[in-house]
């Protein structure tokens, strides 16, 4: 678990449109890296290339490489489905299968992989719900629909579903943007616990959240409309927020633009 990601000369295209240019950074294991920047700068686009989710969009392609412990996830013969098992994704809005039970939501990925043993599935469901700090709240209603949970509980259910297949990396695309402050705090506390076992990359528009949860922060920016987004600066979060090297970074985190 908790593998290193290295992005090298990453360029992302949608058809002829050059969306993101020349990104290079290292994401260290057992740490949280935050992607910040104004809307349209490419941070979510970069996030989705880290497990090849962008490929669901027609015309999407990448140049450069994304290495997971030295292996290029875009290399010949690499199955995108196996990549997404190793590098899990938690989306902006909670997306449990609404009519599926809480238990079945958690183990849906395992069932797709052919796991059918009930004891194994029950053990994984319990372990994953405990890992997502949700077990105590739902252990007496595992057969009820996941869609009946609160928004914050649904997001933790989605995190439980993601970790049930034992990924090495967790990607989170604004996981708290649709949640209230109390639920947001619960997710942030969970992220701090999860980084002991996983490599985590989070996209957030909340500067305070980035400062609270991340060890490293990468700031992306857009030069102009129609131009590709670029990585401006990446460093330890404390340094990014206290003494950034680029003026654009300072202007963004201080609220002068964005």
Swiss-Prot record:
Subcellular location: Cell membrane
Keywords of the record: ATP-binding, Cell membrane, Membrane, Nucleotide-binding, Phosphate transport, Translocase, Transport
Top-level taxon of the source organism: Bacteria
GO molecular function: ATP binding; ATP hydrolysis activity; ATPase-coupled phosphate ion transmembrane transporter activity
Stretches assigned to the ABC transporter domain: 5-247
Disulphide bridges, residue numbers: none
E.C. number: 7.3.2.1
Topology of this chain in the membrane: Peripheral membrane protein
GO biological process: phosphate ion transmembrane transport
Reactions performed catalytically: phosphate(out) + ATP + H2O = ADP + 2 phosphate(in) + H(+)
Family: Belongs to the ABC transporter superfamily. Phosphate importer (TC 3.A.1.7) family.
PANTHER family linked to this entry: ABC TRANSPORTER I FAMILY MEMBER 17
Function recorded in the entry: Part of the ABC transporter complex PstSACB involved in phosphate import. Responsible for energy coupling to the transport system.
Protein name, as recorded: Phosphate import ATP-binding protein PstB
Organism phylogeny: Bacteria, Bacillati, Actinomycetota, Actinomycetes, Mycobacteriales
Gene: pstB
């Amino acid at each position: 678990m908790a593998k290193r990601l290295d992005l090298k000369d990453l360029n992302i295209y949608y058809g002829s449109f050059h969306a993101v240019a020349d990104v290079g950074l290292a994401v260290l294991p057992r740490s949280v890296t935050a992607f910040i920047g104004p809307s349209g700068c490419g941070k979510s686009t970069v996030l989705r290339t880290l497990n090849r989710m962008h490929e669901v969009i027609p015309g999407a392609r990448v140049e450069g490489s994304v290495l997971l412990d030295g292996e290029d996830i875009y290399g010949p013969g690499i199955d995108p489905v196996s990549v997404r098992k190793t590098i899990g994704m938690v989306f902006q809005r909670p997306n449990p299968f609404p009519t599926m039970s809480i238990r079945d939501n958690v183990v849906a990925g395992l069932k797709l992989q052919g796991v059918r043993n009930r004891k194994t599935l029950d053990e994984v469901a319990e372990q994953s719900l405990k890992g997502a700090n949700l077990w105590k709240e739902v252990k007496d209603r595992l057969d009820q629909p996941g869609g009946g949970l609160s928004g914050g509980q649904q997001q933790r259910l989605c995190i439980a579903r993601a970790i049930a297949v034992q990924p090495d990396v967790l990607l989170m695309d604004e996981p708290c943007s649709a949640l209230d402050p109390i639920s947001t705090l619960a997710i942030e506390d969970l992220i701090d616990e999860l980084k002991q076992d996983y490599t985590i990359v989070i996209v957030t528009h909340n500067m305070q959240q980035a400062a609270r949860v991340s060890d490293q922060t990468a700031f992306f920016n857009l030069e102009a409309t129609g131009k590709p987004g670029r990585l401006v600066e990446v460093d330890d979060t404390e340094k990014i927020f206290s003494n950034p090297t680029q003026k654009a970074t300072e202007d963004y985190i201080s609220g002068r633009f964005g």
